[in-house]
């Protein structure tokens, strides 16, 4: 499955909620959900009754869109979550939260997860002192993520530090001005401030 390259706002309208795909714009009245809170397309305003399978599928698509994950990656994370102690749904969300691109976003050094993914891919970060360019990498407790020394003086990062107002979750010890963060815990369900019914995803994959 190829990565979606269309308008981000259409995805939010399809899911009927803000997915925060466009950074700061999502917090303003310019957000498409504020203007047109119905699905895109000719028949978007007449939402049909959805079957249980449809609900499960929509929930999976929603979470994939929030985190910018493709189907193969998502399936692999689900299988990993199933083999971990505890509830599979909560494990899945915890793994998604610990993706490196999401950690950069949670640090406040990117306006969206999409931008965070691009910054990681372009090699602007180090992990435990080593250059890293894999957005899907899952960080662990004790890992230290930093903006690469050569990138710190760029206008891009200076501006991100100046405008940042995001509060890092408690599992992440972030120093935005220092452009660094340390993973001090594992994300729990209470740490994830997203409207997600993860049990529907588990039900879908369990069939």
Swiss-Prot record:
UniProt keyword annotations, A-Z: Ribonucleoprotein, Ribosomal protein, RNA-binding, rRNA-binding
Pfam families, alphabetized: Ribosomal_S4, S4
One GO MF term attached to the UniProt entry: structural constituent of ribosome
Alphabetical GO biological process terms: ribosomal small subunit biogenesis; translation
Residue ranges constituting the S4 RNA-binding domain according to the UniProt record: 98-164
Gene Ontology CC annotations of this record: small ribosomal subunit
Alphabetical list of Gene3D superfamilies matching this protein: Ribosomal Protein S4 Delta 41, Chain A, domain 1, RNA-binding S4 domain
Cysteines joined through disulfide linkages: none
Classification via NCBIfam families: PRK05327.1 (NF003717), rpsD_bact (TIGR01017)
Oligomer and partners: Part of the 30S ribosomal subunit. Contacts protein S5. The interaction surface between S4 and S5 is involved in control of translational fidelity.
Function per UniProt: One of the primary rRNA binding proteins, it binds directly to 16S rRNA where it nucleates assembly of the body of the 30S subunit.
Family per record: Belongs to the universal ribosomal protein uS4 family.
Protein name, entry field: Small ribosomal subunit protein uS4
Organism: Clostridioides difficile (strain 630) (Peptoclostridium difficile)
């Amino acid at each position: 499955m190829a990565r979606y390259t269309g308008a981000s706002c259409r995805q939010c309208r399809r899911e009927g909620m803000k997915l925060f795909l466009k950074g700061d714009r999502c917090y303003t009245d310019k957000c498409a959900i504020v203007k047109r809170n119905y699905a895109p397309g000719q028949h978007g305003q007449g939402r049909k009754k959805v079957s249980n399978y449809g609900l499960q599928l929509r929930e999976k698509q929603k979470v994939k869109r929030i985190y910018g994950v493709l189907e193969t990656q998502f399936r692999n994370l689900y299988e990993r979550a199933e083999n971990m102690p505890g509830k599979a749904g909560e494990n899945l969300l915890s793994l998604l939260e610990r993706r490196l691109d999401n950690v950069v976003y949670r640090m406040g050094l990117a306006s969206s997860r999409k931008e965070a993914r691009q910054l990681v891919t372009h090699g602007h970060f180090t992990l435990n002192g080593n250059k890293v360019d894999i957005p899907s990498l899952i960080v662990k407790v004790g890992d230290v993520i930093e903006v690469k020394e050569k990138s710190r003086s760029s206008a891009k990062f200076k501006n991100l530090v100046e405008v940042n107002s995001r509060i890092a979750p408690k599992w992440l010890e972030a120093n935005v001005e220092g452009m660094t963060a340390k993973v001090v815990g594992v994300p729990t369900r209470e740490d994830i401030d997203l409207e997600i019914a993860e049990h529907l995803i588990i039900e879908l994959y369990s069939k």
